[in-house]
Regions:
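Non-catalytic cap/lid and distal C-terminal segments of serine-dependent acyl enzymes
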Residues: 1-278
């Protein structure tokens, strides 16, 4: 695998880069960003994955996420992939919550999406192999986080791969997409009408079906316009309570769904992951 450098800029003593490569999983060119803090020659660093939300690319968190100072302080590599395949020949939908920019971190089985929308394979298999080959990372020390649709991605990828991730957190995640309009539309469109096929992509369903991790951290603004209909954090609290998973769910007064919220608590999440990644 080879990558092309789109840009590299010095930041907080390290390098913030944007890169692209041809993906076998999606059959498209994919773009992602990586922040590598300053480090000793030959050292390998823990890595924190960040999965973005609906309509986003890698650029949203890269430009507005305010993670670099904390990652530089703690010596953590920060990786931000795109949210879907893009480009000529890639199917799309006019709605903001389906198609390009709304991959939901699934491997689609329905047409016309199945040919390119293989974000689960991309995030779980292809991109980690590329990052391990090209950057100074210690793949035995991985954490994952994300926002909204990406919070759903972080929770489900983490729950499906408990041996890979030492730490899992989320900002305003869609915790039970099978019981939320965004999720029902996306999972039905990408995976078909059989709801059994949706369960590996639903954090609460995964926990109900036996997935276990030691702990989870979730921050949620109580002024989030999507709180009651789409996000429903109380369902995750119920699922974790029944399963004995240590969930820290922090309802943050007055915060909405935006990057103003994410950037406020990003350094805290990076520090929380750092304490678990060593």
């Amino acid at each position: 695998m080879t990558i092309e450098t789109v840009s590299e800029n010095k930041a907080f003593g390290g390098v913030q880069g944007v890169y692209r490569h041809v993906s076998a999983a999606t059959g498209t060119t994919m773009t992602f960003s990586v922040f590598v803090p300053d480090h000793a020659p030959g050292a390998t660093l823990p890595v924190l994955w960040y999965l973005s939300g609906l309509t986003c690319t890698h650029a949203n968190v890269t430009e507005k996420g305010d993670y670099r100072a904390a990652c530089a302080e703690h010596g953590i590599v920060f990786v931000a992939p795109d949210t879907s395949p893009r480009g000529e020949g890639v199917p799309d939908d006019e709605a903001y919550d389906f198609g390009q920019g709304a991959g939901f971190y699934v491997d689609a089985t329905e047409q016309p999406w199945a040919g390119h929308f293989r974000m689960r394979s991309y995030i779980e298999e292809e991109l980690p192999a590329l990052i391990a080959a090209e950057f100074p990372v210690d793949m035995a020390r991985q954490g994952i986080t994300g926002h909204s649709m990406g919070g759903h991605g972080a929770l489900t990828v983490g729950l499906r791969n408990p041996g890979r991730f030492r730490s899992i957190s989320a900002f305003a995640p869609i915790v039970a997409p099978s019981r939320a309009p965004w999720g029902e539309k996306a999972l039905g469109g990408y995976l078909g009408a059989d709801r059994a096929a949706w369960r590996p992509y639903d954090a609460c369903a995964l926990i109900e079906d036996g997935a276990r991790v030691g702990e989870l951290l979730v921050d949620q603004g109580d002024a989030d316009q999507f709180l009651t209909e789409q996000l429903r954090p109380e369902l995750l609290r119920e699922a974790c309570g029944a399963a004995g998973i240590d969930l820290t769910l922090r309802m943050q007064p007055g915060y909405d769904h935006s990057y103003y919220f994410i950037s406020t608590f990003m350094a805290d999440h990076v520090g929380w992951h750092a304490a678990r990644l060593g």
